[in-house]
């Protein structure tokens, strides 16, 4: 499901409409551009490039899109993520929570319409897990981004506005959380 929503896999039927664009009809080049500009991906295992600094990892989507990073945006985002003092560090010099924040920064740098998070707290302790979820909720509120989180952690699922439970490929629960 996450791969279909992220434009990595193609649906066998139907369509996938994100921010008014049917991504299932885009060619590979257009899809790559759309994904880079409109979809933020956060992975359980961070997928940071080990030889790039925190700032370089965060701004990579902009550089791939031929855009010059806005220093004021980077400064504000790094402050929000608690990374201001770590921008020149390499990933191996960071804690797991800090690495996940870099991953979130990279996903947010283009202010995407859709954020897809695959087990974003799976490798973190409970304190860092709650901080990461709070950050995602904050960006949802402040920037109107849709955030879809794939998780096996019931406490994280219950903190969402809406929960859809899928078992063996079928929706077994779809409801608003109170």
Predicted segment positions?
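ABC family nucleotide-binding domain
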Residues: 1-166
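H-loop (His-switch) and adjacent beta-strand-loop-beta switch element
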Residues: 163-176
């Amino acid at each position: 499901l996450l791969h279909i929503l992220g434009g990595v896999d193609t649906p066998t039927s139907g369509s996938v409409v994100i921010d008014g664009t049917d991504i299932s009809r885009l060619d590979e080049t257009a899809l790559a551009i759309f994904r880079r500009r409109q979809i933020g991906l956060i992975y359980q295992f961070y997928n940071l490039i080990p030889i790039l600094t925190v700032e370089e990892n965060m701004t990579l989507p902009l550089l791939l899109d031929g855009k010059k990073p806005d220093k004021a945006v980077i400064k504000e985002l790094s402050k929000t993520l608690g990374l201001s003092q770590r921008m020149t560090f390499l990933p191996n010099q960071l804690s797991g929570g800090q690495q996940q924040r870099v991953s979130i920064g990279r996903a947010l740098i283009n202010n995407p319409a859709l954020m897809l998070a695959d087990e974003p707290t799976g490798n973190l302790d409970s304190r860092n897990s709650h901080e990461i979820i709070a950050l995602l909720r904050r960006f949802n509120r402040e920037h109107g981004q849709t955030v879809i989180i794939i998780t096996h952690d019931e406490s994280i699922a219950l903190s969402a506005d809406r929960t859809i439970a899928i078992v063996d490929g079928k929706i077994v629960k779809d409801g608003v959380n109170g």
